[in-house]
Structure formats: C-alpha cells, structure tokens
Amino acid sequence: MQWYRFYCVVHDRIISGEDLKAEDDAAAIRAVRERDTGYDCELWAGDRRVATIPAEGEPIRF
C-alpha cells in the first residue's frame, strides 16, 4: 500500500486536498473517481504527479 494525496482544483487554484492509501496508481485513481468531487483533481504520490482526473471524462496519466 502506498500513500497518495489528491487536490481538487478550480481555475488553477487548489480548493481542497485529501490523503488516501491505495494498492497502486490505478487503485488510487479509482478511489478519487469514486469520491465524485465534482471538481478536476490532481493525484500525487510524493513529488510525482500520477494523474489529472477531470470532473468528467477519462483521467490523464503521467
């Protein structure tokens, strides 16, 4: 298990952030999607950006 942090973003400003623990990158992306924040989110593992997860549509993985 690995720790991740995701940030919800509006107009390039962070409006919230939350830690989560997941088995791998794919599981972390699913966990963010399941939260259905209604905002675009960025998922990070330490200083590595894992994905940008739009409010609608498919995640963009890095």
Question: Which residue ranges define each predicted feature?
Answer:
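Short aromatic-glycine-(Arg/Gly/Cys) micro-motifs in beta-strand/loop hairpins
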Residues: 1-15
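Generic intrinsically disordered, low-complexity segments enriched for polar/acidic and small residues
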Residues: 1-4, 36, 59
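Extended aliphatic helical segments
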Residues: 9-10, 32, 50
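Local beta-strand/beta-hairpin segments that build beta-sheet-rich folds
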Residues: 15-17, 50
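A short, charged, amphipathic alpha-helix used as a generic interaction element across diverse proteins
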Residues: 24-40
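Short, mixed-charge low-complexity intrinsically disordered segments
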Residues: 38-62
